[in-house]
Every structure is written in structure tokens, then in C-alpha cells.
């Protein structure tokens, strides 16, 4: 039985992988090979059979190659889609939509073709998914992600024209990308349910991962209103995912 973790080279993805049953074959994927090698070494030291496979989730062909590789190792039973980017990573608004939103489409579609009854996909969203007022969420554009990617991105980012601050523009695009993840996970759950495949999304707050630490300056504003008053740990999220 195979468990695939996108964005599994570090952070909550790797933490979740370490908490999977020891009989799982773990495949960690990402774009930084040095991180993947370290992750595989840690997983093997913990007693797992583990492999690394580079993957750019913003490209369908790369996701397809990952799915095919995982299927060649055994029955894919778990997919944890933790790969993503945030505004502090110096990416464009379009990058945020392509990697976070369209990447989720590619992962769910390509892996579901190779999964069977009893398997599970967990798409990692964000608390930011719920930070945008409903009137500003372009849900009517979401279905375009499967039929016209360019138009989907154009319509999803339409409201950013009214935002002047560059970081706030990217923050809005990020929130929309993660709101899309929650929507698409629900859509996938409905579509794949008859095959016995479960799909769920998880929306973390600010987590002390490499990506989360980049957001800590702006995220401090959110922490001031949180009940814990601190960032979450990758291990806490890994437990919730696994």
C-alpha cells in the first residue's frame, strides 16, 4: 500500500508521512531534491520503505508522472497533497493560482484514476480560505479550472484590480487559491464517492514550517487573535492529517 505526499520534503507533509502506518510505502515529492533526499533518509531511519520523486504540481504532466510512479510501487491508498506556495515566497498572483488551485485539480484527477475503494485524498487548504467575504469569492469561476485554465485565472483574480498594496494583492490571490482547494475537495468527494474514494480538505492556521515562518511577520496579526497565541507545529498538523 502506497502513501504519496506532495510537498513531502519538509513541514507538515513530512510530519504526516512519519505518522503513517509502517506497512505503507511512502513516496515524497517536491521540487527541491536535497529536501527530498533528507526526507527519505529520515523515513527510512524510522522504519519505512520510502522513495523520492521530483514533481512540479503546477504542471499536469509532472503530476501524471508522479501518479504513474506511485502506482508502479503498489496500490495507492493515501494521497496527502501538501504542496503549495504563499505570498511571502515571492511568487506572482498567477503562480499562486497555478500551483495551489490548478495543482489540486491535477493531483485529484490524476491520482483518482489510479485509486480504488477505501483510498483517501487529503488536500491541504488554509485558514485563509475563510478570510475573504463571500461577495468577493469568485465561485462562479471555479468550474472553469477544469475547462479553461486561462479564463479561470483571469476571473479568479478580477477583484485584485481594486487592491493597491502589492502584498495585499498576493494575499487575496492566496486566499482565493485556498478557498478553491476547499471547494474542489468537496466537488471531488462528490464525484469520487461512488468509487469508494474519500476526499477531504484541511485548513491549517499559521504553522511553523519553512513557508509558515516566511509569513510570520504578517501572520503575527492573526496570532494576536488566536486562542493559543502561537504558531502550530508541523507535528500537530501531521497528526491531524494522518
Give each language-model segment a name.
Residues 43-61:
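Rossmann-fold cofactor-recognition segment
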Residues 106, 174, 179, 201, ...:
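C-terminal helical subdomain
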Amino acid at each position: 500500500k502506497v502513501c504519496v505526499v506532495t510537498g513531502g520534503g519538509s513541514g507538515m507533509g513530512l510530519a504526516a508521512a512519519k505518522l503513517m502506518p509502517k506497512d505503507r510505502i511512502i513516496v515524497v515529492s517536491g521540487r527541491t531534491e536535497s529536501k527530498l533526499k533528507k526526507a527519505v533518509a529520515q523515513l527510512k531511519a524510522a522504519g519505512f520503505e520510502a522513495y523520492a520523486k521530483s514533481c512540479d504540481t503546477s504542471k499536469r504532466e509532472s503530476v501524471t508522472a508522479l501518479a504513474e510512479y506511485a502506482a508502479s510501487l503498489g496500490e495507492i491508498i493515501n494521497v496527502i497533497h501538501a504542496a503549495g506556495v504563499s505570498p511571502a515566497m515571492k511568487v506572482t498572483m498567477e503562480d499562486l493560482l497555478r500551483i495551489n488551485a490548478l495543482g489540486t485539480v491535477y493531483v485529484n484527477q490524476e491520482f483518482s484514476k489510479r485509486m480504488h475503494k477505501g483510498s483517501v485524498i487529503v488536500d491541504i487548504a488554509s485558514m485563509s480560505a475563510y478570510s475573504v467575504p463571500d461577495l468577493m469569492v469568485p465561485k462562479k469561476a471555479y468550474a472553469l479550472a477544469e475547462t479553461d485554465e486561462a479564463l479561470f485565472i483571469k476571473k479568479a483574480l478580477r477583484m485584485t484590480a481594486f487592491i493597491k498594496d502589492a502584498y495585499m494583492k498576493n494575499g487575496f490571490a492566496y486566499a482565493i487559491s485556498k478557498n478553491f482547494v476547499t471547494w474542489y475537495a468537496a466537488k471531488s468527494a462528490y464525484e469520487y464517492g461512488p468509487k469508494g474514494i474519500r476526499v477531504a480538505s484541511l485548513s491549517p492556521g499559521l504553522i511553523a514550517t519553512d513557508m509558515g515562518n516566511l509569513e510570520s511577520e504578517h501572520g503575527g496579526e492573526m496570532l494576536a487573535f488566536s486562542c493559543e497565541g502561537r504558531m502550530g507545529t508541523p507535528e500537530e498538523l501531521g497528526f491531524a492529517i494522518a
